[in-house]
């Protein structure tokens, strides 16, 4: 509720109090109210003229000319009682008119006082609003400090976790390097994959260079925005303080003008009315300026909200990056587990190979024992076949020495068998039958070898298909990565366009700020002129006690404004400190982003090494398969030799 000041009542005017006009009231409402008040006064006083000074001058002329008027004087210069009554009646009427004019002026002055009081009330209300806004700013600053502390704690925790992860990754890299050295000795790298990797690395380097340039542009734009942020709040506070001072000075100027009007009211009524109109126009201009300032404040609040939203988005981006890092770490763990499993498979295969080798040695020993027994039996049973046994011994020694030259040994066996046919013509038929059986067995062996070769070809084809499928998958992954990179580039282009728009807006704001500064300078010059006038008026105001009270109130208000300015300065200092802290936090965030980039590069290198190791493991597995096939072939050949020997015996 607005306060209702006490006004003096008039018997002819309505008794309701004059409600104050709101500072946002339009010109038409005030003009209409003033016109109604004037009409009421003229209706109740029809005898008064528009100018009171003329009526007073007429009465003086009548007083002077009373002695010279032939109608009112006698021939002897004596006044009749009727003339004296008329003169006294006229004199009373003139006095009444003067009193009514003075009452009218007093009422106008009281109305002006009420308006001035209401203006002071509104200024005090605005000061209270500013105090509330300052408190809100302080609370926001406290909240921002708390949020900054939480961010620092989170950043420290993330830094410790990253250090641990880096140490663990370094240990893993050392182990992997050792394994890679061992694998390089046993494997041969593919040239086509190297060329593809080189091309992809070149593409990645180009993309990273473009990203670094974009980041530098973004940083420069952020710095510009921070500078604009630093300039805007200071200018707002100064502008508000200047406006309050100007309002107070305008109020004091109005009061002094009213005092001067009271001293010269009887002579300058018309000038006072003109001044009232001018003052009303000035008030309306002030109201318009206040509206413009409120709109500017709203725009600045919207900008601050947008900046807060940007900060929140940046925090969300940081959270997303941390989640990506966690996912990458999980992928690294999975790859390490795969490597361990592959190593275990390799150990198992090596153990199997060792077991097979041991079995081969045992079989060789058994064969040697059997051959020795056969030789002993041959010596006991057949003394005549000593020459043949010696030849068989030679053949067995050759088989032991050269396992790979089994075919040559078979030819020698044929030659030896032919010699045996020449020596033993009696057993030709039996030997022919044995030869036919040997031919059949050899055909069977050849068929088995062909079957084994077909199986090997099938295995190789399956491996080739698997490799082709893996290559297709890798190519699909590469296509997906290229599409993602293109999407990121499009996003970066969009961000650059937005940043350019923001720069244009900032330039427009800077131009507006410069215009405001020029206006403020002009207003300060006007204020200096007004202060000089106020010095002259204060000497006159010392005579009036009422005006002194008003001056004391104004001084109290000025002290409050000074206190508010000091508080605002303190708030500005706090804001500067907070901005410095925010800058430090942003620098920390930039350093963390650089570390994240380095870690991503390391992860890419590790993934490439893992791929190379997997290829080497695949090659080793293929070699193991080939070795197993060879061992099987050797075992079959050894069995065939044993059968030949048994048949020959």
UniProtKB/Swiss-Prot annotation:
Coiled coil found in the keyword field: yes
The UniProt record lists the keyword DNA-binding: no
Biased composition range(s): Basic and acidic residues: 25-46, 80-94
Source taxon at top rank: Eukaryota
Keywords: Coiled coil
Coiled-coil stretches: 151-644
Compositionally biased residues, Low complexity: 10-23
Region Disordered, annotated ranges: 1-94, 300-330, 358-440, 455-572, 584-620
InterPro entries cross-referenced by the UniProt entry: GOLGA6L (IPR026737)
Feature: compositional bias, Polar residues: 47-57, 65-77
Family classification: Belongs to the GOLGA6 family.
PANTHER family according to UniProt: GOLGIN SUBFAMILY A MEMBER 6-LIKE PROTEIN 1-RELATED, TRICHOHYALIN-RELATED
Name this protein carries in UniProt: Golgin subfamily A member 6-like protein 26
Source organism of this protein record: Homo sapiens (Human)
């Amino acid at each position: 509720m607005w306060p209702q000041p006490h006004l003096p009542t008039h018997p002819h005017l309505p008794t309701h109090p004059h409600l104050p006009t709101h500072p946002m009231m339009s010109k038409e409402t005030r003009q209409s109210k003033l016109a109604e008040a004037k009409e009421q006064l003229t209706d109740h006083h029809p005898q008064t003229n528009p100018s009171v000074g003329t009526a007073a001058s007429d009465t003086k002329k009548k007083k002077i000319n009373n002695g010279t008027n032939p109608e009112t004087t006698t021939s002897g210069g004596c006044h009749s009682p009727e003339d004296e009554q008329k003169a006294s009646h006229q004199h009373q009427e003139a006095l009444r008119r003067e009193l009514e004019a003075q009452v009218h002026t007093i009422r106008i002055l009281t109305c002006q006082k009420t308006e001035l009081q209401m203006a002071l009330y509104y200024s005090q209300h605005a000061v209270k609003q500013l105090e509330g806004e300052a408190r809100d700013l302080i609370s926001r600053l406290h909240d921002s400090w708390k949020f900054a502390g939480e961010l620092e704690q989170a950043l420290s925790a993330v830094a410790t976790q990253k250090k641990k992860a880096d140490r663990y990754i370094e240990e893993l890299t050392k182990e992997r390097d050792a394994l890679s050295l061992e694998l390089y000795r046993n494997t041969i790298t593919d040239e086509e994959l190297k060329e593809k990797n080189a091309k992809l690395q070149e593409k990645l380097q180009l993309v990273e260079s473009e990203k670094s340039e974009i980041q530098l542009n973004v940083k420069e734009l952020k710095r510009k925005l921070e500078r604009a942020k630093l300039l805007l709040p200071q200018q707002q506070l100064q502008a508000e303080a200047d406006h309050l001072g100007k309002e107070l000075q305008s109020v004091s100027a109005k009061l002094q003008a009213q005092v001067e009007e009271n001293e010269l009211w009887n002579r300058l009524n018309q000038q006072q009315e003109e001044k009232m109109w001018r003052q009303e126009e000035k008030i309306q201009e002030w109201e318009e300026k206040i509206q413009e300032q409120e709109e500017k404040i709203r725009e600045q609040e919207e900008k601050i909200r947008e900046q807060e939203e940007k900060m929140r988005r940046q925090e969300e981006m940081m959270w997303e990056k941390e989640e990506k890092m966690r996912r990458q770490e999980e992928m690294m763990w999975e790859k390490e587990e795969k490597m361990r499993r592959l190593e275990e498979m390799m150990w198992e295969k090596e153990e199997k190979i060792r077991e097979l080798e041991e079995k081969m040695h045992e079989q060789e020993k058994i064969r040697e024992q059997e051959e020795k027994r056969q030789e002993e039996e041959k010596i006991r049973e057949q003394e005549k076949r000593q020459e043949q046994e010696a030849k068989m011994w030679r053949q067995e020694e050759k088989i032991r020495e050269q396992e790979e030259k089994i075919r040559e040994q078979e030819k020698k066996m044929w030659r030896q068998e032919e010699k045996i046919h020449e020596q033993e013509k009696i057993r030709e038929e039996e030997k022919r039958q044995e030869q036919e059986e040997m031919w059949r067995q050899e055909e069977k062996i050849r068929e088995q070898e062909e079957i084994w070769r077909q199986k090997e070809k099938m295995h190789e084809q399956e491996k080739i298909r698997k490799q082709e499928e893996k290559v297709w998958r890798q190519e699909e992954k590469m296509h997906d990565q290229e599409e993602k990179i293109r999407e990121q580039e499009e996003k970066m282009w969009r961000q650059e366009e937005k940043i350019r728009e923001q720069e244009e807006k900032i330039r427009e704001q800077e131009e507006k700020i410069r215009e405001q500064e020029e206006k403020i300078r002009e207003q300060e010059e006007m204020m200096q002129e007004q202060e000089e006038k106020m010095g002259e008026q204060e000497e006159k105001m010392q005579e009036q006690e009422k005006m002194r009270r008003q001056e004391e109130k104004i001084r109290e208000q000025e002290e409050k404004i000074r206190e508010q300015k000091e508080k605002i300065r303190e708030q500005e200092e706090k804001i500067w400190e907070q901005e410095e802290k925010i800058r430090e936090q942003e620098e920390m965030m930039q350093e963390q982003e650089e570390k994240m980039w380095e870690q991503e590069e390391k992860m890419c290198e590790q993934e490439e090494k893992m791929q190379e190791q997997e290829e080497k493991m695949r090659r080793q597995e293929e070699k193991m398969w080939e070795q197993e096939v060879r061992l099987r072939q050797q075992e079959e050949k050894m069995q065939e030799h044993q059968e030949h020997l048994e048949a020959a015996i």
